[in-house]
């Protein structure tokens, strides 16, 4: 029997979030609904999840000693990584000494870079993937691109939100693609993956939950990416029964191998009835923000329920729904918004993340929509997102 304590009491159940972005904010909110004591950690102050946590810390999470000091001080019952740029060797050490890491330290370590999870999927689990090579320098990169053939894609083994990722259509693109890949990697990593570009029909995220009562799947989520980053998502994504069965089989094999309890975002390419494995995140997925409106239990609620050790039971999908990103371009440390009255129509919702600053393009929120069809839901979400404008509050006169 799992015992759940009350926040800010002697027997409080504590969850420490490593990475305090918009996805983590929703995880914290779900923990708060269960009376859990929450601690948010990130590399910068006033990150979204810090706004709703009981306490927060600002630290470089690649610094093992600094991170260990905070964890030792707080003694959380659950360590919940929200991002990849964490000292994973420390998580392994802590787990070996009895600390609960969500879903488990091995899953976090394997998925922190593209090489670990791609080799697991293709070489250990023998799942269908695009042809690929991992390389460390420009000469090897050029050779790999020619051998794999054009068009191909280059990605840093450690990056997120499409940083450093580009499509190479000919040898003329190689120099710029290599330079960009080196600028976009996390944690000083120069290694990249070069992979064949698959002519897929569409790509999906299959949110897969490993819980005490078995494996559960959400309905497939379709999404649109630009420059490797999510711009819109919708659920359910229509696909053949054969492809769906293959997708669920692949997702099951991956999450069962990774282990632990929690929600996993399994990214797949669909080509007719064929399914190719792409990547997996052992945590809620940005495309899954649509589940805030499309399901009775969002991906965040499912993640929390699973890692606490409680059964999922069932997941009810509520019809055609979509999300669209609010992605302005400006520079400000005092962001204000207009246009919400235009965006807030029937069957639309808004989530503003309260990010403290912006320099260039940055995802500041999403609009969620429910409609009678996926096409109309996408249109409604996009119209809502376009209506919301972000401004520098220091210079905006009509506040």
From Swiss-Prot:
Where is ATP annotated to bind? 114, 155, 160-165, 195-198, 203
Please give the family membership noted in the entry.
Answer: Belongs to the PurK/PurT family.
Provide any one GO MF term from the record: phosphoribosylglycinamide formyltransferase 2 activity
What is the protein's known function? Involved in the de novo purine biosynthesis. Catalyzes the transfer of formate to 5-phospho-ribosyl-glycinamide (GAR), producing 5-phospho-ribosyl-N-formylglycinamide (FGAR). Formate is provided by PurU via hydrolysis of 10-formyl-tetrahydrofolate.
Q: Which GO terms describe its biological process?
A: 'de novo' IMP biosynthetic process
Task: Provide the protein name.
Answer: Formate-dependent phosphoribosylglycinamide formyltransferase
Keywords from the UniProt entry: ATP-binding, Ligase, Magnesium, Metal-binding, Nucleotide-binding, Purine biosynthesis
Q: How does it associate, per the subunit comment?
A: Homodimer.
Source organism per UniProt: Proteus mirabilis (strain HI4320)
Gene3D superfamilies registered for this protein in UniProt: 3.40.50.20, ATP-grasp fold, A domain, ATP-grasp fold, B domain
Metal-binding found in the keyword field: yes
């Amino acid at each position: 029997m799992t015992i759940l304590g009350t926040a800010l009491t002697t027997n409080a159940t504590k969850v420490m979030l490593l990475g305090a972005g918009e996805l983590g904010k929703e995880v914290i909110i779900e923990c708060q609904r269960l009376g859990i004591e929450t601690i948010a950690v990130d590399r910068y102050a006033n990150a979204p999840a810090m706004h709703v946590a009981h306490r927060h810390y600002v630290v470089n999470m690649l610094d093992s000693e600094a991170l260990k000091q905070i964890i030792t001080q707080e003694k959380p019952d659950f360590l919940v990584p929200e991002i990849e740029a964490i000292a994973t060797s420390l998580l392994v050490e802590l787990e070996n000494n009895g600390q609960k890491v969500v879903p488990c330290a091995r899953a976090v370590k394997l998925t922190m870079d593209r090489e670990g999870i791609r080799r697991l999927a293709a070489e250990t689990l023998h799942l269908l993937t695009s042809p690929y090579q991992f390389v460390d320098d420009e000469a090897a990169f050029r050779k790999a691109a020619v051998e794999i053939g054009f068009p191909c894609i280059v990605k840093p083994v450690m990056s997120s939100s499409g940083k450093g990722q580009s499509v190479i259509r000919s040898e003329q693109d190689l120099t710029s693609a290599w330079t960009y890949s080196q600028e976009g990697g996390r944690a000083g990593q120069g290694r990249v993956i070069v992979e064949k570009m698959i002519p897929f029909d569409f790509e999906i995220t299959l949110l897969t939950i490993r819980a005490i009562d078995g494996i559960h799947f959400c309905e497939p989520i379709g999404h649109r990416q630009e420059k490797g980053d999510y711009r819109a998502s919708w659920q359910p994504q229509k696909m053949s029964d054969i492809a769906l069965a293959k997708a669920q089989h692949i997702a099951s094999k991956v999450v069962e191998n990774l282990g632990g309890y929690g929600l996993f975002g399994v990214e797949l390419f669909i080509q007719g009835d064929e399914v190719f494995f792409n990547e997996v995140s052992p945590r809620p997925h940005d495309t899954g923000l649509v589940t805030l409106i499309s399901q009775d239990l969002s991906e965040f609620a499912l993640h929390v329920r699973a890692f606490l050790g409680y059964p999922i039971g069932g997941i009810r999908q509520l019809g055609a729904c979509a999300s669209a990103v609010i992605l302005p371009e400006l520079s400000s440390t005092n962001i204000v918004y207009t246009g919400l009255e235009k965006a807030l129509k029937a069957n639309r919702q808004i989530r503003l993340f309260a990010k403290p600053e912006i320099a260039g393009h940055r995802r500041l929120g999403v609009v969620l929509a429910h409609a009678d069809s996926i096409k109309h839901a996408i249109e409604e979400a996009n119209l809502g997102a376009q209506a919301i404008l972000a401004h520098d509050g220091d210079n905006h006169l009509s506040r």
